[in-house]
């Protein structure tokens, strides 16, 4: 078990400058926001269970791969399975040319949506497809589970993002394709070996989040997620080092992956133990830790523990200036989704936000968001009414602070997904945000 005072910390890689940038070949989705760059970190830690690891790769021995441009992407999107097969085959052939045929282990850090940081069912399917492709056609490599003990051998690391995008020139419409980035990293050097970019059709991508991310109460683009995305996408070129914060937090990412798998297998006690264990080595604002500790406490019926974890979640969001919560409503209405368990959680979330905002004497703007399933005008009106509903509940929970709470409707202007499905696939588009603002 890893603890703060007893973990074995190992210097494995040293960062070398800032990673370069290249022009993006397509526009982002309608929110148009790029994730903030994390602060550089120049050391990495690695802790495997009951194993002392001491791996230091001198800079002089690390193979240097000449920078290369990403090959042009196909002009029209194809079905996801076609895209994964094509991009994966090209990526792995590129890597074999760079590295040779020496046997290597390979791990896959689960793919994410670069707009939300969530893992989706389509991303899981793509990872499984590539693991089978390696086993069948790229025999020098052996796919290992993404766990701490596998990282001890400095394997090859495969990362990827699958993100909705608008391909029109202005980039301000609804998404009409998914952008698929694949990046292969050699952890012996910390450098990118190969990259590939492709596009998949909307209809072929199941964007429903996996159970852990579906159940998580909050969302924001934390530093660790941002570092993953920077390492995977256009900002980092072949031959360059991956983001140092991402590499530094790889042991935590592997431990959190084990915890998420346990949660999704409904092994809640095991999952909670792993989430607590990850607290010592993960970034302080990592929402997988904060959300995982809350969710597992709730699932185990430990309501007092869940309340304490909720306090940490809310405090983290308010300290950051924005706390998005997935307070979901029935499509087209201001009635919250039914279900005794869900509504009980909503009540606790809102009460805790009210309590902490009141204690801080903070002014909050409650911003409603809706899916892109109606006109712009109607979406603003509906999101305003939803925000007003939550503002009223906040004022009920903290009567003396009610005049410091205001409501605003954003419509679908700040959609992260933009599909307009009004279901779990675009649940984050219907979030309620509690933004800390200056008091009048």
Q: What are these regions, as identified by a protein language model?
A:
Residues 22-65, 69-102, 187-280:
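C-terminal/domain-edge helix-coil "capping" segments
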Residues 117-127, 131-132, 304, 337-340, ...:
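Periplasmic OmpA-like peptidoglycan-binding domain that tethers envelope proteins to the cell wall
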Residues 17-20:
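C-terminal motif of bacterial Sec signal peptides marking the signal peptidase cleavage site
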């Amino acid at each position: 078990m890893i603890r703060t005072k007893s973990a074995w910390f190992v210097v494995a890689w040293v960062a070398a400058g800032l990673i370069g940038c290249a022009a993006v070949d397509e526009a982002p989705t309608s929110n148009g926001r790029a994730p903030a760059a994390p602060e550089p970190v120049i050391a990495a830690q690695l802790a495997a269970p009951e194993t002392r690891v001491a791996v230091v790769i001198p800079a002089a021995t690390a193979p240097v791969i000449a920078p290369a441009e990403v090959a042009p992407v196909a002009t029209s999107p194809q079905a996801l399975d076609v895209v994964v097969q094509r991009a994966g085959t090209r990526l792995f052939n590129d890597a074999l040319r760079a590295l040779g045929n020496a046997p290597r282990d390979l791990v896959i850090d689960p793919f994410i949506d670069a707009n939300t940081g969530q893992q989706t069912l389509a991303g899981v399917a793509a990872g499984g497809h590539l693991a089978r492709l390696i086993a069948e056609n790229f025999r020098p490599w052996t796919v290992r589970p993404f766990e701490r003990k596998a990282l001890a051998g400095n394997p090859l690391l495969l990362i990827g993002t699958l993100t909705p995008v608008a391909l029109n020139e202005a980039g301000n419409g609804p998404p009409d394709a998914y952008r698929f980035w694949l990046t292969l990293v050699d952890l012996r050097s910390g450098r990118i070996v190969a990259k590939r970019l492709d596009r998949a059709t909307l209809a072929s991508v199941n964007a429903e989040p996996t159970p852990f991310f579906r159940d998580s109460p909050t969302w924001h683009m934390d530093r660790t997620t941002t570092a993953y995305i920077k390492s995977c996408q256009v900002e980092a070129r072949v031959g360059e080092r991956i983001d140092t914060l991402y590499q530094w937090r790889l042991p935590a990412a592997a431990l959190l992956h084990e915890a998420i798998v346990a949660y999704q297998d409904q092994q809640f006690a095991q999952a909670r133990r792993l989430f607590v264990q990850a607290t010592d080595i993960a970034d302080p604002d990592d929402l997988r830790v904060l959300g995982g500790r809350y969710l597992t406490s709730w699932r185990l019926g430990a309501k007092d523990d869940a309340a304490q974890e909720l306090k940490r979640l809310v405090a983290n969001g308010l300290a950051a200036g924005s706390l998005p919560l997935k307070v979901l409503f029935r499509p087209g209405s201001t009635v919250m989704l039914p279900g005794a368990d869900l509504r009980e959680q909503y009540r606790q979330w809102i009460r805790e936000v009210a309590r902490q905002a009141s204690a801080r004497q903070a002014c909050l703007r409650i911003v409603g968001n809706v899916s892109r399933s109606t006109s712009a005008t109607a979406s603003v009106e509906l999101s305003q009414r939803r925000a007003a509903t939550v503002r009223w509940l906040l004022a009920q929970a903290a009567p003396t602070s009610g005049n410091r709470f205001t409501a605003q409707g954003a419509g679908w202007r700040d959609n992260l997904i933009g599909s307009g499905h009004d279901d779990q696939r675009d649940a984050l588009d219907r979030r309620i945000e509690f933004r800390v603002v200056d008091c009048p």
